């Protein structure tokens, strides 16, 4: 009778340990998501990369050169301060 109880205890203990380990393994081990990213890193194809235009648009004039547009430079700040600090004479 004692041997049967020990055998049942050990069997249940092994079963519980295997069950706990299998749940932890499913929770923490993640295999590569083949559906999310179909490209194989070992054999990349041109479809795997993001396409960029050959000649991206760039405006020829920058704020620092102050040509053809107002970038909110010194003149804009000066106008704002003049309107705020307008002192009646």
Curated annotation (Swiss-Prot):
A Pfam family of this chain: RALF
GO biological process: calcium-mediated signaling; cell-cell signaling; regulation of growth
Signal peptide interval: 1-25
Location relative to the cell: Secreted
Keyword Electron transport included in the entry's annotation: no
Residue pairs linked by disulfide bridges in the UniProt entry: 39-48, 61-67
Keywords: Disulfide bond, Hormone, Secreted, Signal
GO-annotated cellular components: apoplast
Gene Ontology MF terms in the entry: hormone activity
Statement: the UniProt record of this protein carries the keyword Disulfide bond: yes
Superkingdom field: Eukaryota
Principal localisation: secreted
Induction comment from the UniProt entry of this chain: Accumulates during senescence.
Family under the similarity heading: Belongs to the plant rapid alkalinization factor (RALF) family.
Cited function: Cell signaling peptide that may regulate plant stress, growth, and development. Mediates a rapid alkalinization of extracellular space by mediating a transient increase in the cytoplasmic Ca(2+) concentration leading to a calcium-dependent signaling events through a cell surface receptor and a concomitant activation of some intracellular mitogen-activated protein kinases.
Protein name according to UniProt: Protein RALF-like 5
GN (gene name): RALFL5
């Amino acid at each position: 009778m004692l041997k049967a109880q020990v055998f049942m205890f050990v069997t249940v203990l092994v079963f519980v340990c295997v069950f706990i380990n299998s749940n932890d393994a499913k929770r923490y081990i993640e295999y590569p998501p083949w559906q999310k990213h179909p490209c194989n890193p070992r054999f990349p194809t041109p479809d795997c990369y993001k396409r960029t235009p050959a000649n991206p648009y760039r405006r020829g004039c920058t704020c620092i050169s102050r040509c053809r547009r107002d970038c909110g430079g010194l003149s804009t700040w000066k106008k704002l301060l003049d309107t705020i600090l307008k002192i009646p004479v």
